[in-house]
Amino acid sequence: MRNHLGGGSRALVVLVFTISAAVTGWNMQARAATPTPGAARYRVSMTADDTGTIWQGRESVTFSNTGAWPLDHVWFRLWANGHGRCADPAITITDTVGGAWADPVVGCTAVRVDLSHALQPGSDATVSFRFTLQVPKRDGRFGNADGVSLLGNALPILAVHDGAGWHLDPYVGFADSFYSLASSFRVTVDTPNALDVAATGGQVQRSTANGRTIRTFMARHVRDFALAASSFSRVSRVVDGVPVRVWYAPNVIAATTARWVDRLAARSLTTFQKAFGAYPARELDVVLTRLPNEGGMEYPGIVFVSPSFDAVAHEVAHQWWYASVGNDEYGAPWLDESFATWSQTLPFDPWTRCDRYDWPSSSVRLTDGVDYFRRHPYQYGVIYSGGGCMLANLAGRFGLGRFETMLRGYAHDHRNGVTDGSSFRAAVIRAGARYLPGFDARAFWRRWRVT
């Protein structure tokens, strides 16, 4: 996500946001370190009204207990309710099969499902339900503005249980609260012919009849599924075997803007593949929109972004840092935002020197979670500028080529998995031993407030 980065500068303008009421954590006592439920297979069919703002459908999720103990329940995240919360929910669930649904909690963004029977380790279960989704009239990753419907974090997905318990963190408008495991999606989208659809995954089927178009998208090893619907125009090309498409509403975005974004996305893709390894998705869809503060939002294989140089490169970089190398975005937001911030400089002028960072307070740490930044929102830019500065410092110490070699190995080791701070620190320590004899990792982490 990019919502704090200034135009062409590496200094970030930190905005003060209104914070919604804090909601206490709901984590269970940890019983297993292995994340579960895993190997989820989502099957979704959804139908849009004429405007693309009301969707009805059915979702079926088959998942495995990848933990060491039986599961008698799971949790689903209903992130579509994040903005309106319980007072104005955007998604409603009915006709559930495979478990009993409790009342939603955490601002109606989390719901417990008691399974029909205890799920033993290594066994599978299936839960299905009908849903109605109302896309709100607003700018944002989930909203409709200027005739463009963005469905980011809209479909219900499984919450994660790991060594910290169930992750049931609250929705935060200025940050990301999302944490999910790599899964597969098969999503069939039924729309009026007038609506085009850009989505996660590849389109594998398409048919048209009676004024409507039915498209089926498939994606494997992805953490979520997002789509955009509108009467789009598009610019497309193939980059190193990867289809790249830039989607735009011509009444909102000029064709000349879409063309330079196409060139920028292509350059970013080529640069990042050389630096971090093969692009992790089948294709890249860039949906241009007018998100607030020249911002953007990343999803597997698709990004929603305002047309700015920094934002486009930043969101494409997230295809490696979060979409492929996953992390708990609420508990450790620096693990994707710092990396995307540093990476966004590579297509233009690689950031390889940053010897000093002006911390906004003595208490903030680069490794703080969103819980801290909800109390101190003006310090949230630390995970962008502070983390980017730290990585630039490492790039300068190691040399850019060696640093990229380290990052390629790190990305390979955690591809389609979940990383944490200790994994990155270990990668740096190994690289330091190889490239910088005498590198004092402990002093380095203290200096950059990595705990």
Language-model features and meaning:
Residues 83-148, 211:
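A surface-exposed beta-strand-loop module
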Residues 66, 118, 175-179, 183-197, ...:
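Zn2+-dependent metallopeptidase catalytic core
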Residues 130-226:
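Extended, low-hydrophobicity, Ser/Thr/Pro/Gly-biased non-transmembrane segments
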Residues 300-357:
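Zinc-dependent metallopeptidase catalytic helix centered on the HExxH motif
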Residues 71-99, 152-155, 190, 194-195:
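Solvent-exposed beta-hairpin/edge-strand motifs
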Residues 54, 67, 380-451:
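Amphipathic alpha-helical substructures
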